[in-house]
Amino acid sequence: MPGSAPLILASASPRRLELLAQIGIVPDRVAPTDIDETRRKAESPRELALRLAREKAAACDAEGAFVLAADTVVALGQRNLEKAADETEAADFLRLLSGRAHQCITGVAVRAPSGQIVSRAVLARVKMKRLTEAEIAAYVASGDWKGKAGGYGIQGAAGGFVTAINGSYTAIVGLPLYETKSLLEGLGYRR
């Protein structure tokens, strides 16, 4: 039935809005949530991404609406590379990722108007070329690393550093579209 309950995007990410638009979904409202994103002791990157997405969906004040939330974690082994705090940390992250494969895990959660929450974690493996100090410096100077897990955005200039991807490109950007659409439709969301 067209015109089901409204959809609220619990994220400030412009990339997530752009990705949703690619599949014809425009949220009725954007309402980012503020939760503690600290990793718990012994929590795997996958568990962290799922928990944060679920907590964001639960924390959104949107009674009677569908709520979509997501969180992306970049992991090198069991080490999380969060959003870089500054240029030095962004450069350090790129040095760590240089010439290596890492994982991007995006947790997606949808809360139905009934309060039921369903979620899924989507993992993609990304391999970067060996970066020169000049490439790292130029990328960091561009500012494109700001606000991005792992200190880079594959949809920008850093896409030129990636030699291989195994998994969902849209999960790396921040919202796996197939899984997101499936979760929404499974709970009865219709546009």
UniProtKB/Swiss-Prot annotation:
Major location (coarse): cytoplasm
Localization (cell): Cytoplasm
Enzyme Commission (EC) number: 3.6.1.9
Keyword terms, alphabetized: Cytoplasm, Hydrolase, Nucleotide metabolism
Swiss-Prot/TrEMBL cofactor(s): a divalent metal cation
The protein's enzyme class: hydrolase
Example GO molecular function: UTP diphosphatase activity
InterPro entries: ITPase-like_fam, Maf-like
Residues marked Important for substrate specificity (site): R15, T72, Q155
N-terminal signal peptide: none
GO CC annotation, single: cytoplasm
Function according to Swiss-Prot or TrEMBL: Nucleoside triphosphate pyrophosphatase that hydrolyzes dTTP and UTP. May have a dual role in cell division arrest and in preventing the incorporation of modified nucleotides into cellular nucleic acids.
Protein name: dTTP/UTP pyrophosphatase
